[in-house]
Amino acid sequence: MNTFGHFLRVTTWGESHGRAVGCVIDGFPAGLEVDEEFIQREMERRRPGKKYTTQRKEVDRVEILSGVFEGLTTATPISMVVWNVDADSSAYESLKTVFRPGHADYTYWAKFGVRDWRGGGRASARETAARVAAGAMAKLLLRRYDVKVMGYAKEIAGVSCEVDDAEKAFERAERSPLRMPDERAEKEAEQRLKEAMSEGDSVGGVVEVVAKNVPAGLGEPVFGKLDAYLAYAVMGIPAVKGVEIGAGFEAARKRGSENNDPIVLKDGRIRFATNNAGGILGGISNGEDIVLRAAIKPTPSISKKQRTVDYEKMEEAEISVKGRHDPCIVPRAVPVVEAMVALVLADCMLMQGLIPRSLL
C-alpha cells in the first residue's frame, strides 16, 4: 500500500538512494493559494545535515509538477518531487547479503525475495520527505479554517519534558536542536545522547502533537473512528512503535472519576474541563485539542557490533553499520508526525463536508 486517505488521497513513491522521492495528492480542493515558501520551511524542519542528525546533505527543494496554476490549486492531482542529490551507496556495498538488525531488510526479502540494499530503499525514512510535502499542503488547507497542528519532542533518551502550553512549547522547541521545549530536559537528554554516540549507539523518544481548533464531529462510529485513523496514519511512519491519544496508557491506571472529563459551559458553549480524552470521544472529535503521542524507536543503524545472518552463505555474521545516520531520529520525526495528523484532519473535514471541493 503506497496510497493513504479517503477523500484526500496521497500516494508516495521513491527510494532512499533512487533519483528522487515524491508524492501525488488527489482530491485536493480547488482555489487554495499555495504558499511555496511555507512548504519549503516545512521541508527544512525535516531536512538532514543539522546537529545530531545524519550528515547526508539533501537540499530537499520541492518541485510542484502539476495541480497548481497561477498560484492556485486546480482540483487536479498535485504532483510533487524532491530530488536526491547526496545519496552515497558505497557504505552499503558490504551489506548486500547481510540483514541489518532493527531494519526492514529481512522482512522485505522474506516477502518479496528482492530488496534495495542501498540505505533501506523504500523502507528508509527518506520516504517521509514526501509525506512532509503532502502534509504541508494539508496544513495550508487547515490554516484556512484556523486549525493548527504543532509538535515537539516530548521525551528523548528517557528524559521527559513538562508542557503546559502547546503553542509556547512549539515555539521554544523550534529553536532547540533536539526540538525539546524544556531547556532543563534538553540538557540532560543531550548528555545521554552524547554518551550513546560515544559508544556507537543511538536513542529513541516520544513525539507529542497537538491540533488546536479542531471542530467537533470529525470521525465515524465504530470502524471509522478518528483516533483509529490517526493511529493508523502515524503507525505507518518508519520507526514509530506505538501511539497514544490523550491520557493514553495512563488512563489504565486511573479511576473513572479521575479519567472522565467534566462537561461544562464556557462562554455559552459546551466544553470539557480537562482533556484526558485527547479531544476524541467514541471515535469522534469533541472540540477540544487533539493530543497524540508517538513512540519512536532508537535508530537501528549503529556502529556498535551486532549479530546477524549472511543469507548468501547462510551463516551467522557480525555487523557494524557504517555510513551517515541519525543518532536520534526524534527531532526530525516531529514534522513527519505533524504531517500525517494534518492529512487525517483535512481528509476528515472533507468527509464531513466542512471543506468544499472549490474554495473560490
From Swiss-Prot:
<comment type="similarity">
    <text>Belongs to the chorismate synthase family.</text>
</comment>
<dbReference type="InterPro" id="IPR000453">
    <property type="entry name" value="Chorismate_synth"/>
</dbReference>
<dbReference type="InterPro" id="IPR020541">
    <property type="entry name" value="Chorismate_synthase_CS"/>
</dbReference>
<keyword id="KW-0274">FAD</keyword>
<feature type="binding site">
    <location>
        <begin position="297"/>
        <end position="301"/>
    </location>
    <ligand>
        <name>FMN</name>
    </ligand>
</feature>
<feature type="binding site">
    <location>
        <position position="324"/>
    </location>
    <ligand>
        <name>FMN</name>
    </ligand>
</feature>
<dbReference type="GO" id="GO:0009073">
    <property type="term" value="P:aromatic amino acid family biosynthetic process"/>
</dbReference>
<keyword id="KW-0028">Amino-acid biosynthesis</keyword>
<feature type="binding site">
    <location>
        <position position="282"/>
    </location>
    <ligand>
        <name>FMN</name>
    </ligand>
</feature>
<keyword id="KW-0456">Lyase</keyword>
<comment type="pathway">
    <text>Metabolic intermediate biosynthesis; chorismate biosynthesis; chorismate from D-erythrose 4-phosphate and phosphoenolpyruvate: step 7/7.</text>
</comment>
<dbReference type="GO" id="GO:0004107">
    <property type="term" value="F:chorismate synthase activity"/>
</dbReference>
<dbReference type="GO" id="GO:0009423">
    <property type="term" value="P:chorismate biosynthetic process"/>
</dbReference>
<protein>
    <recommendedName>
        <fullName>Chorismate synthase</fullName>
        <ecNumber>4.2.3.5</ecNumber>
    </recommendedName>
</protein>
<keyword id="KW-0057">Aromatic amino acid biosynthesis</keyword>
<keyword id="KW-0288">FMN</keyword>
<dbReference type="GO" id="GO:0010181">
    <property type="term" value="F:FMN binding"/>
</dbReference>
<dbReference type="InterPro" id="IPR035904">
    <property type="entry name" value="Chorismate_synth_AroC_sf"/>
</dbReference>
<feature type="binding site">
    <location>
        <begin position="122"/>
        <end position="124"/>
    </location>
    <ligand>
        <name>FMN</name>
    </ligand>
</feature>
<keyword id="KW-0285">Flavoprotein</keyword>
<dbReference type="GO" id="GO:0005829">
    <property type="term" value="C:cytosol"/>
</dbReference>
<keyword id="KW-0521">NADP</keyword>
<feature type="binding site">
    <location>
        <position position="46"/>
    </location>
    <ligand>
        <name>NADP(+)</name>
    </ligand>
</feature>
<dbReference type="Pfam" id="PF01264">
    <property type="entry name" value="Chorismate_synt"/>
</dbReference>
<comment type="function">
    <text>This reaction introduces a second double bond into the aromatic ring system.</text>
</comment>
<dbReference type="GO" id="GO:0008652">
    <property type="term" value="P:amino acid biosynthetic process"/>
</dbReference>
